[in-house]
Design a protein with these regions (language model features):
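Conserved beta-strand hairpin/beta-sheet module of binuclear metal-dependent hydrolase folds
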Residues: 3-65, 155-158, 162-165, 263
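Metallo-beta-lactamase
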Residues: 4-8, 102-153, 200-206
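Active-site metal-binding motif and surrounding structural segment of the metallo-beta-lactamase
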Residues: 43, 54-101
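Active-site neighborhood of phospho(di)ester-bond hydrolases with catalytic His/Asp-centered motifs
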Residues: 48-50, 72-80, 99-103, 164-168, ...
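Short acidic active-site motifs
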Residues: 87, 290-294
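FMN-binding flavodoxin-like domain, especially the glycine-rich phosphate-binding loop
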Residues: 176-180, 184-219, 223-226, 269-284, ...
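Short N-terminal or domain-adjacent regulatory/targeting segments
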Residues: 220-248
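Short, charged N-terminal beta->alpha structural module
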Residues: 255-277
Length: 393
């Protein structure tokens, strides 16, 4: 990414990272990720956020080009997480007259990351919810957004151009240069939201209510493309995702964790039975699918079938991983069917139910499919019963 002109006064100076394989050291990003940063040029010059250490040098080059000899007056810190805040201390050292804008928690975390001497007290501008900063013809109003998805997060609204600088909100996996505007924005925005921010639905809902009072023409997130045009579709997605409602309530996810293939084969048979009854079904092999994709599909669907082998008296680990992630992300309000396999002591259904009992408003079907080694006619009969119960919910 080079300098991107968002308007005459607002420039994007972010950087694409196409060599990263795992975002937050856990989420695959096959098309990379962007670290976005912005500059507002007015009587006063403001930089909004820095970038990850992986992108420091190209970001500084973009910044130098955008500033064109100016010295920045302010650095606004929306989010202290290192993929955005890693270069705060370096920028403060490069521009010793620059003031740093954040809220009280921003500076608490800044001191924890860099030490209290990185940004001297007299250089700090501590803002509260609803306070504004005039740059000249441009004015930034700060809206605190705690736990979207860190406690110190705040977004900034520029009123003259109706721009919302949304921090991690409305972010998306994928390098911006590789994003086709005709492509599906929601696919990787959904996976980003549900895995990064998904736990904090009530906090996102609160922020959406604040945003509804603003006249927004452009959204500038810290990851992914700048959003313009009809913004209602993006806002509607966020309203849906943060409410924990199923995006496709009639769709069923059949997810299997199979050691030698027999549980997966049984899960496929179950999926085919559901399809034969008119259901829309997606199958996922948890041993071959990263958990972030499975979490995303689980939230997207209204009903789920979990098929798992028993392993050393516990759940086969890929299923345990999925259930742990779902619980962490506040998964709720779904109907779940259970299938278990075990050659001598099948226990997976009991163990999965125990995990699901710790989640909110989860309905577990009474019918359970129990397989001993490989599915037979008796197991298939149980599948028919489970399919009917699941579709009746």
């Amino acid at each position: 990414m080079s300098v991107k002109k968002i308007s005459e006064a607002i420039l994007g100076v972010g950087v694409d990272d196409t060599t990263i394989d795992l975002f937050e050291s856990q989420y695959p990003v096959p098309t990379g990720v962007s670290y976005n940063s912005y500059v507002i040029l007015d009587e006063k010059t403001a930089i909004l956020d820095t970038v990850d250490n992986r992108a420091t040098e190209p970001w500084l080059a973009n910044l130098t080009e955008a500033l064109a000899g100016r010295k920045p007056d302010y650095l606004v810190v929306s989010h202290m997480e290192p993929d955005h805040g890693a270069n705060i201390a370096r920028l403060a050292a490069l521009y010793p007259e620059m003031q740093v804008v954040g809220n009280a928690k921003t500076f608490l975390y800044m001191d924890q990351f860099f030490g209290a001497d990185a940004v001297a007290k007299e250089r700090r501008v501590v803002v509260k919810d609803g306070e504004s900063l005039s740059l000249g013809t441009h004015t930034l109003t700060f809206v605190l957004a705690p736990m979207v998805h860190w406690p110190e997060v705040m977004v900034s609204y520029e009123s003259s151009e109706k721009v919302l600088f949304s921090a991690d909100g409305f972010g998306r996996f994928g390098a911006v240069a590789r994003f086709d505007k005709n492509a599906d924005w929601a696919s990787e925005a959904r996976r980003y939201y549900l895995n990064i921010v998904g736990k904090y639905g009530p906090q996102v809902q609160a922020l959406l209510k604040k945003a509804a009072a603003l006249d927004i023409a452009t959204i500038c997130p810290l990851h992914g493309p700048v959003l313009t045009g009809d913004l209602s579709k993006y806002l509607n997605y966020y309203d849906l995702w943060s409410s924990y409602k199923a995006e496709e309530p009639e769709k069923i996810l059949v997810a299997s964790a199979s050691i030698h293939g027999h549980t997966k084969a049984a899960a496929h048979t179950m999926a085919e039975k559901l399809r034969a009854k008119g259901a829309k079904v997606v199958e996922m092999d948890l041993t071959r699918t990263d958990v972030s994709y499975a979490v995303t599909e689980a939230f997207r669907c209204g009903r789920i079938v979990l098929a798992c082998a028993t392993y050393d008296g516990f759940l086969f680990p890929p299923m345990e991983t999925l259930l742990t992630h779902l619980k962490t992300k506040n998964f709720q309000g779904r109907t779940v069917g259970l299938m278990e396999n075990g050659t001598w002591a099948p226990m997976a259904a009991k163990l999965m139910r125990a995990e699901l009992d710790g989640m909110k408003n989860i309905t577990v079907c009474d019918a359970v499919v129990t397989i001993r080694s490989a599915a037979n006619a008796a197991a298939e009969a149980q599948m028919d019963v489970l399919a009917d119960e699941l579709l009746a919910k």
